[in-house]
Amino acid sequence: MAAMRLTLFRIVCLLPGCLALPLSQEAGEVTALQWEQAQNYLRKFYLHDSKTKKATSAVDKLREMQKFFGLPETGKLSPRVMEIMQKPRCGVPDVAEFSLMPNSPKWHSRTVTYRIVSYTTDLPRFLVDQIVKRALRMWSMQIPLNFKRVSWGTADIIIGFARGDHGDNFPFDGPGNTLGHAFAPGPGLGGDAHFDKDEYWTDGEDSGVNFLFVATHELGHSLGLGHSSVPSSVMYPTYQGDHSEDFSLTKDDIAGIQKLYGKRNKL
């Protein structure tokens, strides 16, 4: 169980002392409910320093969040801060720039297997299969890794849709908010990518959540990437609503993944 918790990059601190000092708000523009939502957001996505074992000020964590998103580092809640906090996003905590996951975990085999074990009812199964294949190809075009799908048994990356508590200690929260999460490369749950079944998943339509975009993001985590602070990056933590069919990895995404695996030789 301990290993399971440490595998996911989204290790959430739930201890009451994690956010030791209360947040303040600018000009009374934030409601009590939003104040509570902000505290919960910082507990989830901006973790305390486990090495020093010191209680972390909520103000410091808010400044860290403001720095990540390119906002003035006031340490105070504002409507702009709340707007970002309320956007749909990935369930993995934020780091900085194109960053890698702690200890830079990666796959050491040149062939990585994957298996899709459950589906959304919003899209035909064959289309989900095609989208996952396309998302993985975006990454494999940049690095010397190949992906092989298996239909049964074990696989390096297990992909599926689930709702609520789905057995990994990180339950989904219904429509909106957390869209999915993924585990760093490794044994057991390592590499697995989960998507919230309660979202309305689409294939690039004007409404709903673009599955290709979110799948590409989560599978980036499955390969070892953390979040990027570059808004145009696929690895940016909040959902950008990019519905275009021809979106691609940015220079930031490519730099991150090639730092882990090197470049694919072009013939």
Swiss-Prot record:
First and last residue of the signal peptide: 1-20
Cofactor note (record): Binds 2 calcium ions per subunit. Binds 2 Zn(2+) ions per subunit.
EC number: 3.4.24.23
Binding, Ca(2+) 1: D156, G188, G190, D192
UniProt KW Signal keyword: yes
Residues the entry annotates as binding Ca(2+) 2: D173, G174, G176, T178, D196, E199
SMART domains: ZnMc (SM00235)
Subcellular location: Secreted, Extracellular space, Extracellular matrix
Required cofactor(s): Ca(2+); Zn(2+)
Active site: E218
GO BP terms: antibacterial peptide biosynthetic process; antibacterial peptide secretion; cellular response to mechanical stimulus; collagen catabolic process; defense response to bacterium; defense response to Gram-negative bacterium; defense response to Gram-positive bacterium; estrous cycle
Top-rank taxon, per record: Eukaryota
Catalyzed reactions: Cleavage of 14-Ala-|-Leu-15 and 16-Tyr-|-Leu-17 in B chain of insulin. No action on collagen types I, II, IV, V. Cleaves gelatin chain alpha2(I) > alpha1(I)
GO cellular component: a single term: cell surface
A Pfam family reported for this protein in Swiss-Prot or TrEMBL: PG_binding_1
Keywords: Calcium, Collagen degradation, Extracellular matrix, Hydrolase, Metal-binding, Metalloprotease, Protease, Secreted, Signal, Zinc, Zymogen
Major place of residence: secreted
Propeptide: 21-97
Binding site for Zn(2+) 2: C90, H217, H221, H227
Motif Cysteine switch boundaries: 88-95
Family statement: Belongs to the peptidase M10A family.
Name of the protein described by the UniProt record: Matrilysin
Species, as recorded: Rattus norvegicus
Gene: Mmp7
